[in-house]
Amino acid sequence: QRQMCIRDRDNRWQWFLSGLGYTLLISFFAVLVGLVIGVVMAFGRLSKNKLFRGISGLYIDIIRGTPTMVQLLIIYFIIFANVNIDRWMVGVIAFGINSGAYIAEIVRGGILSIDQGQTEAGRSLGLTQRQTMTYIIIPQAVKNILPALGNEFIVLIKETAVIGMIANIDLVGAARKVQSLTYDYVVPMLSIALIYYVVIKIVSTLLKACLLYTSPSPR
């Protein structure tokens, strides 16, 4: 039993490493799901179709008006109650749906930020509404929304901590395992706080570098 305890203590770093891996995995795929949903819902909000516009607006209002943790619990315990699915995938779906509502507003705001004269110029050149949106509006809007999308990814990394409500697979779950082994509740939580901080700083630095690379150089 003493050897087992020593072995478990030696595995603590592996628990944290595995938890970090799941945190990043869930965040990455969730933001991809959120991006797809967000783009669709953004165009829904801008649509002239009242039904599509109404559905998109209702989705955004409900998701932004309810806590992420409640959405996660509803999806896991109600929607997927009788479905055999990995819990990390439930997290991807739940956080993706949540992120989609915020990304929708980011994308919509980016499109609306483009001067109306750009649309009029495209139409005057003989382009259709879709061609104007595809070749003139969207390329400019993408540059405007990239910083906000980066911030959404950072927020998502931190929000994934609530997946501990359904599974101890992320960093918080790793801290709980260490706590149950050592009965120390301070060091494990401070450790994952430090890990989160370092990860966020690295991601923020990489995002800033990408933005600088994609931004036009001043002349």
PLM regions with names:
Residues 3, 7-215, 219:
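Transmembrane alpha-helices and adjacent helix-loop boundaries
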